[in-house]
Amino acid sequence: MGSSQEEGLPCQPSQPDHDTGGHGGPDLEGAGRVSTTPGPPGLLTSHPPADSDDTDATGPPAALLEGLLLGDGKPSPHSTRPGPFFYIGGNNGAAIISSYCKSKGWRRIQDSRREDYVLKWCEVKSRDSYGSFREGEQLLYQLPNNKLLTTKIGLLSTLRGRAWAMSKASKAPGGTQARLGKDATAPTLEDLPWTSPGHLRPQRVLRMEEFFPETYRLDLKHEREAFFTLFDETQIWICKPTASNQGKGIFLLRNQEEVAALQAKTRRAEDDPIHHKSPFRGPQARVVQRYIQNPLLLDGRKFDVRSYLLIACTTPYMIFFSHGYARLTLSLYDPHSSDLSGHLTNQFMQKKSPLYVLLKEDTVWSMERLNRYINTTFWKARGLPKDWVFTTLTKRMQQIMAHCFLAAKSKLECKLGYFDLIGCDFLIDDNFKVWLLEMNSNPALHTNCEVLKEVIPGVVIETLDLALETFQKSLRGQKMLPLLSQRRFVLLHNGEADVWPRLGGSCSLRRRLPPPTRQAKSSGPPTPRAPDQPGTRRPVPPPLAPQRPQLPGPSPDPDSAHDGQPQAPGTGDRHPEQEPSPGTAKEEREEPENARPWGGHPRPTPHAPATLPAFRDL
């Protein structure tokens, strides 16, 4: 999960979360498909491919980006310099991304210090990249503080914070909905039932312990002492560094001797004076997590499922789900084995086996193949619904991913141009219960087997398409839906109905915001207004928090807005894998206690010349 690097600190390039062994250069497989995938009209597709892979010429990215985005793909007539430019740091998916950008006439630059790019995709987050980022003019991959979701401790703390907030709200008079001002009749994602073998039960609140294994932090004394006290040899626990990937630094705890050794090691580290003087030189923080000893097996082998959470836009939030693939071990599962390759499914671990060269195609299954196997092997024997993978499993993964995002939403840094693709790993136990293992920044985008060649390029291309289209619509002040570039991704959360400003946001663009979903009562009907036309500008009082860009238009109907409800394109003829998950997450319409609605005051018009000087001068 995640990366071991701290932002702004000298470090080696991070590795994708798995599947990098043996890769010394850019992955060329699958890259040829990029140019054949049509993008939506007007999304930077009119340029012929550039011949050069690098250039030393410079050009104003704001003018170029506005000319391309707002001029339906045509370069700005005010700029005669080469460009626009893109930068890729690292090899993970570089060939696919580069081919995509070149097909739009963009030119690749190799100097990471240059600031005249329109797209920057890096494996390693850099403080300088965020410091020089020009909001509304550039696209930058990875949210600055995505570690809230993509490190072990970050995700654990985020989920605990959500659980605490929901517990506190539920104790208020009238329950959670009364405290949070909810419409008790509105359908919610977590009000609807979900299917498990043999029974159907309502799931009113998604509780952390139902999808996330019991976990303790070893960097906190009271938590590690609690773990050392409760451990017994009937259990297996797995110890993980908080920010490593590829299975590095992971080991199992199965007996008192191993736990005693870990206890002594943590005490030595705590007593080390260097650790107290310089926390950066201390050992990396770790967690211990209850190991799921009864995983569902495919022909006797352990597997997990990689899915994707896409944050295509942060102003407003546009959050999507996409299927990925199943990852299997080469060896048969033995809970007592000390060989980690039988416990960890990622490709980096499987490549260590001498059998990998011969059997690598059988270590990655498509979701369609997994669905066929479940139908054939377990459908009738375990009383599962038909196509369990594309119905129950899909909906459950969407529920969990939406819950995790909502838990972090108010704390994530959001600027127009930030986007992120996060790999989410799920394990299914032999009772068909779905567990979230971890969420990964910089998910592996290599295509070293046939299934990955079919899955990865499509995921990357649609990620970039959706990031560009949502950026364009937010910049123009247009409504987000429908999205012409949405194909396989399923919409989990449409933030157009969110109450602004958000906590944790740092957006400086000042554009018109829609009224909040819950409006104050008035004696007369609201004044009608064309959906894409700004209202009359009047003086605005000083905001209580930084103003956030959002789209113009009338107040969204809470019964029809897609706030948290997965929406797939072409719902009239939907593949089972695009089955939307039910309802809107109950917490999704929450707002932090100190986040205030605009209270009826008019908001700024869509254009803000003072904050976009390059656009003003055109």
Swiss-Prot record:
SUPFAM superfamilies cross-referenced by the UniProt entry: Glutathione synthetase ATP-binding domain-like
Amino acids binding ATP: 240, 246-247, 289-292, 302-304, 345-346
Biased composition (Basic and acidic residues): 585-594
Binding locations of Mg(2+) 2: 438, 440
E.C. code: 6.3.2.-
Domain TTL: 82-479
One term under GO cellular component: microtubule cytoskeleton
Listed GO MF terms: ATP binding; metal ion binding; protein-glycine ligase activity; protein-glycine ligase activity, elongating
Enzyme class: ligase
Subcellular location, record wording: Cytoplasm, Cytoskeleton; Cell projection, Cilium; Cytoplasm, Cytoskeleton, Cilium axoneme
UniProt cofactor(s): Mg(2+)
Positions bound to Mg(2+) 1: 425, 438
Annotated positions for site Essential for specifying elongation versus initiation step of the polyglycylase activity: 246
Main location: cytoplasm
Signal sequence coordinates: none
Domain text: Gln-246 is the main determinant for regioselectivity, which segregates between initiases and elongases in all tubulin--tyrosine ligase family. A glutamine residue at this position is found in elongases TTLL6, TTLL9, TTLL11, TTLL13, TTLL10 and favors glutamate-chain elongation, whereas an arginine residue is found in initiases TTLL2, TTLL4, TTLL5, TTLL3, TTLL8 and favors initiation.
Annotated protein name in UniProt: Protein polyglycylase TTLL10
Species of the source: Macaca fascicularis
Lineage: Eukaryota, Metazoa, Chordata, Craniata, Vertebrata
